[in-house]
């Protein structure tokens, strides 16, 4: 984790409670001194997740407007969907995670279900 102080990490959050968990992780890592960015490719649906996102924005955590670069040497935290996923996953998002996993530039850690994996299969 010490290398992440220099290279940073990106928390990719989803529209529901799993995304809120990701925002909390981003907050806690930021408060411990890590370089943290957050990217949310969805419209947030859950009130609590909206509140968490608002709070981390007020702390000065970088909110990315575009997808993170898979070639950068940073850790990605996948907080997109949880066990109760009911919607299909965007194929562009799956491809982005696949690109990252093929590089030797950082890692992906999923806090629940890895993006692209069907929780019902």
Report residues per predicted region.
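Glycine-rich phosphate/dinucleotide-binding loop and adjoining beta-alpha-beta core of small-molecule
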Residues: 5-121
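Conserved alpha-helix/loop element of class I SAM-dependent methyltransferases that forms part
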Residues: 1-3
């Amino acid at each position: 984790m010490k290398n992440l102080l220099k290279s940073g990490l990106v928390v990719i959050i989803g529209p529901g409670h799993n995304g809120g968990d990701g925002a909390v992780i981003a907050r806690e890592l930021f408060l411990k001194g890590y370089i943290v960015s957050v990217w949310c490719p969805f419209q947030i649906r859950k009130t609590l997740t909206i509140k968490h996102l608002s709070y981390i924005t007020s702390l000065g955590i970088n909110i990315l407007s575009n997808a993170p670069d898979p070639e950068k040497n940073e850790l990605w935290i996948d907080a997109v969907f949880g066990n109760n996923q009911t919607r299909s996953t965007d194929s562009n998002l799956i491809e982005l995670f696949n690109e990252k996993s093929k590089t030797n530039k950082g890692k992906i850690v999923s806090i629940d279900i890895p993006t692209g994996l069907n929780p019902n299969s």
